[in-house]
From Swiss-Prot:
UniProt-listed CDD domains: PIN_XRN1-2-like (cd18673)
Known EC number: 3.1.13.-
Residue ranges with Basic and acidic residues bias: 920-937
Species per Swiss-Prot/TrEMBL record: Homo sapiens
Protein name: 5'-3' exoribonuclease 2
Length: 950
């Protein structure tokens, strides 16, 4: 989803939705790796039924990772993908279904975003290669050290698009992987696996949602199925809420900013290519055996609990005294719809609504304020009530001017703070900073850019003396740098990037000044704001987009041909008269074919993935569609600071012209290219232990050519139709490995078959409601009336999936072990450094502690085992105090008491002294009530009621 900061905003506003995954790691014994047994209970105290993998979120980080060296070839990429899936599977451990969905041909509305992203990737890749070569030449010219440049072909991530050879090979590798795991992994024993590869049209996450919607509409569906969806896109959260399933969880890799990345030139960490100085790499390990080790740890996974998010939203959206019945499911649908205004993959966000400015909170407040005017909800099962939406947008339009002014004030304030911070840091810098080879360096800073550490100080000093002796005479007026070398009299010209103030991008619109609407339409659309007809056309297209996106989320693709034909969005104040705008879409549209989509989204630099005659249309000056593939294009920052936040001003592809040009080159396709250009479907896999195994085998034995209904009683209520697969995996047939480093499967028992979801009429409406029989999970958030209804009980927060999860507990043997290995003096409690009491209780009187008596009192019989290794409590907490008995005068033996305390002090310090021989800080709370102090002339007071040891 086109909201990069959405997940960060969501996790900060609703923190309890996040749960850290408990992951069991594989073990290694005698050099043999022992995988995790996924058939055992889930260590996260929850059992998932279905696991859905949005595979593109796995393919990209495995093929071109940012925080580690990339795989050397395609085979290593496939193995990395297999290992990533294994890791996810061992965390989630699904019991019924594993659904793998790879992005297929996308709707036309998404192709514009894909086109922009791929053109940007190609442009940035070429610019990075040019910059890398320039820095390399500069470093080598200065005598720097760089490893020899590897002659290898740069991996073009644009090949991760339907129709390429890479995606076709990936589908074959995943078929082999599924067969291998179903044959050999006990955790996959009774699992149903569905693979929807790139030949099946649709985005991966929407293919998953379409499967869930169609299964929910079946009478045999279990309404309490626990779903787990893997993916990092923000729209997965919206899609999960749109299912109205009570048990829906998202697993994603935890994002950790500022991860170390290796330099593209020297492969060292700590600097980028532009800062590389060509310094030799420091040896890691005695024999450089740790050269390939990475400083970054393996990424961790987190769970996002949508049932907890539903609790948050129910509290936030609940309204009293409504003119209609409150329905939390409908209000959540409205919340999902309002999130579309701050951005998505199909529409640009409104200029006045930024996620970083709490735009969603603003929309929710307006939504609750005008609900009495609207008289109902904004949406119903994916269909929009435009009359009510108009009231919301006009209310936003009334505050647009103040939003723009506040945004400008906040930006100016931020720049002032940054400028003052730079001045303060510059002022606090020391006047002289030592540098050079002999300068002391902090531990661990040898890998920092620019650091030079002398391995032989004596030799380095000798070389410096010889260099000074051989240098020409220097005038007295010559200035020196910190390392002793003369600096030019004229000084060094300061670089542009060293300036105190960074140049701000030119903004011709100036939304914070009067006349902002006229300037916006003139600069962005090249029309006058007074052109009411054009403005209404832009608004109508945007309203159509809102209806299309909501229908896409709740009902499926309404039209494969529709798209938003502008680069920018209108203002909220322009949403007048939208209630009468049509929101119907052309029916019966078909998706592009894979190679046709490649022609629509690829730049000319990625034409090597296309057939030669098709590729020529991208680069031939005489091509009828050459204008679709500009070599360079402008990026409008649109008020932003960084290029990646800007808008790529690419021409839109005319579908009619594209198809007309491709008709001439279609005959040039080979049979293999024709196969890759065809649309496919899903494939279902089961092992020999699955109840469906024998049923599918019988279909192959009978050779049935007609689709057959899936028996739901054999596969947990899954319904659809089976048809025979021409490339099926069958028992007793060898499954050849497409990856040379992996072995063939000679004893296969897995069977595969084509699978098709249940089909419905084109005008069928999937109801956005919670199904009958669905049980909501137990509430996780603290009840708002807990203080009134708890009768003084303390609230116990739920940290994981199970509220009754047993806490970690050690038995008495473990406490004895801890008490044995931990010295008494190393305790950290308030009594750890306290001296023994000066008196001990004998009979009913306090007596002096004689030298021959034991220094440690006897432990109480009812002491908890976990307290035994912490040392005994003070004596006055152990003994019963009798108020009716007097105390002996302490004066006769006060001298003995002082002598005894004086004798104890050296022993205590000798026992607790640190490495330097100095005693630690005493923390015996001397002088407070209940704690002894030297020279006290009265008996200790009775114990207070705050201590209870029973």
């Amino acid at each position: 989803m086109g909201v990069p900061a959405f997940f960060r905003w969501l996790s900060r506003k609703y923190p309890s939705i996040i749960v850290n995954c408990v992951e069991e790691k594989p073990k290694e014994c005698n050099g043999v790796k022992i995988p995790v047994d996924a058939s055992k209970p889930n260590p996260n105290d929850v059992e998932f039924d279905n696991l859905y993998l949005d595979m593109n979120g796995i393919i990209h980080p495995c093929t071109h990772p940012e925080d580690k060296p990339a795989p050397k070839n395609e085979d290593e990429m496939m193995v990395a993908i297999f290992e990533y899936i294994d890791r996810l599977f061992s965390i989630v451990r699904p019991r019924r279904l594993l659904y793998m969905a790879i992005d297929g041909v996308a709707p036309r509305a998404k192709m514009n975003q894909q086109r922009s992203r791929r053109f940007r990737a190609s442009k940035e890749g070429m610019e990075a290669a040019v910059e890398k070569q320039r820095v390399r030449e500069e470093i080598l010219a200065k005598g720097g050290f760089l490893p020899p440049e590897e002659i290898k072909e740069r991996f073009d991530s644009n090949c991760i698009t339907p129709g390429t050879e890479f995606m076709d090979n990936l589908a074959k590798c995943l078929r082999y992987y599924i067969a291998d795991r179903l044959n050999n992994d006990p955790g996959w024993k009774n699992l149903t696996v569905i693979l929807s590869d790139a030949s099946a049209p649709g985005e991966g996450e929407h293919k998953i949602m379409d499967y869930i919607r169609r299964q929910r509409a079946q009478p045999n569906h279990d309404p309490n199925t626990h779903h787990c969806l893997c993916g990092a896109d923000a729209d997965l959260i919206m899609l999960g809420l749109a299912t109205h399933e009570p048990n829906f969880t998202i697993i994603r890799e935890e994002f950790k900013p500022n991860k170390p990345k290796p330099c593209g030139l020297c492969n060292q960490f700590g600097h980028e290519v532009k800062d590389c100085e060509g310094l030799p790499r420091e040896k890691k390990g005695k024999h450089d055996e740790l050269a390939d080790s990475l400083p970054c740890a393996e990424g961790e996974f987190i769970f996002l609990r949508l049932n907890v998010l539903r609790e948050y939203l129910e509290r936030e959206l609940t309204m009293a005294s409504l003119p209609f019945t409150f329905d939390v499911e409908r209000s959540i649908d409205d919340w999902v719809f309002m999130c579309f205004f701050v951005g998505n993959d199909f529409l640009p966000h409104l200029p006045s609504l930024e996620i970083r400015e709490n735009a969603i909170d603003r929309l929710v407040n307006i939504y609750k304020n005008v609900v009495h005017k609207t008289g109902g909800y904004l949406t119903e099962s994916g269909y929009v009530n435009l009359q009510r939406v108009q009231m919301i947008m006009l209310a936003v339009g009334e505050v647009e001017d103040s939003i723009f002014k506040k945004r400008k004030d906040d930006e100016d304030s931020f720049r002032r703070r940054q400028k003052e911070k730079r001045k303060r840091m510059k002022r606090d810098q020391p006047a002289f900073t030592p540098s050079g080879i002999l300068t002391p360096h902090a531990l661990g800073s040898r890998n920092s850019p620019g650091s030079q550490v002398a391995s032989n100080p004596r030799q380095a000093a000798y070389e410096m003396r010889m260099q000074n002796n051989s240098s020409p005479s220097i005038s007295p007026n010559t200035s020196f740098t910190s390392d002793g070398s003369p600096s030019p009299l004229g000084g060094i010209k300061r670089k542009a990037e060293d300036s105190d103030s960074e140049p701000e991008p030119e903004d011709n619109v100036r939304l914070w000044e009067a006349g902002w609407k006229q300037r916006y339409y003139k600069n962005k659309f090249d029309v006058d704001a007074a052109d009411e007809k054009f403005r209404r056309k832009v608004v109508q297209s945007y309203v159509e987009g809102l209806c299309w996106v909501l229908r896409y989320y709740y009902q499926g693709c309404a039209s494969w041909k529709w798209y938003y034909p502008f680069h920018y969005a209108p203002f909220a104040s322009d949403f007048e008269g939208i209630a009468d705008m049509p929101s119907d879409f052309e029916k019966g549209t078909k998706p592009f074919k894979p190679l046709e989509q490649l022609m629509g989204v690829f730049p000319a630099a990625s034409g090597n993935f296309l057939p030669p005659s098709w590729r020529k249309l991208m680069s031939d000056p005489d091509s009828s569609i050459i204008d679709f593939y500009p070599e360079d294009f402008a990026i409008d920052l649109n008020g932003k600071k960084y290029a990646w936040q800007g808008v790529a001003l690419l021409p839109f592809v005319d579908e009619r012209r594209l198809r007309a040009a491709l008709e001439e080159v279609y005959p040039d396709l080979t049979p293999e290219e024709t196969r890759r250009n065809s649309l496919g479907g899903d494939v279902l896999f089961v092992g020999k232990h699955h109840p469906l195994h024998d049923f599918i085998l019988e279909l192959y034995q009978t050779g049935s050519t007609e689709p057959v209904e899936v028996p739901p009683e054999l596969c947990h209520g899954i319904q659809g139709k089976f048809s025979l697969d021409e490339e099926a995996i069958l028992p007793d047939q060898i499954v050849c490995s497409p990856v040379p480093m992996l072995r063939d499967l000679t004893q296969n028992t897995v069977v595969s078959i084509n699978f098709k979801d249940p089909q419905f009429a084109e005008d069928y409406i999937f109801k956005a409601v919670m199904l009958p029989g669905a049980r909501k999970p137990a509430a996780v958030l603290k009840p708002s009336d807990w203080e009134k209804s708890s009768n003084g009980r303390q609230w116990k927060p739920q940290l994981g999936f199970n509220r009754d999860r047993r806490p970690v507990h050690l038995d008495q043997a473990a406490f004895r072990t801890l008490g044995h290995v931990m010295p008494r003096g190393s305790g950290t409690g308030i009594y750890s450094n306290a001296a023994p009491p000066p008196v001990t209780y004998q009979g009913n009187l306090y007596r002096p502690l004689l030298r021959g008596q034991a220094q440690i009192p006897k432990l109480m019989s009812n002491m908890r085992p976990q307290d035994s290794w912490r040392g005994p409590p003070p004596l006055f907490q152990q003994q019963r105090f009798d108020r009716g008995v007097g105390a002996e005068p302490l004066l006769p033996w006060n001298r003995m008491l002082q002598t005894q305390n004086a004798a104890f002090q050296p022993n205590q310090y000798q026992m607790l002294a640190g490495p330097g021989g100095y005693p630690p800080r005493r923390d015996d709370r001397g002088g407070r009530q209940g704690y002894p102090r030297e020279g006290r002339k009265y008996p200790l007071p009775p114990p207070s009621g705050r201590y209870n040891w029973n």
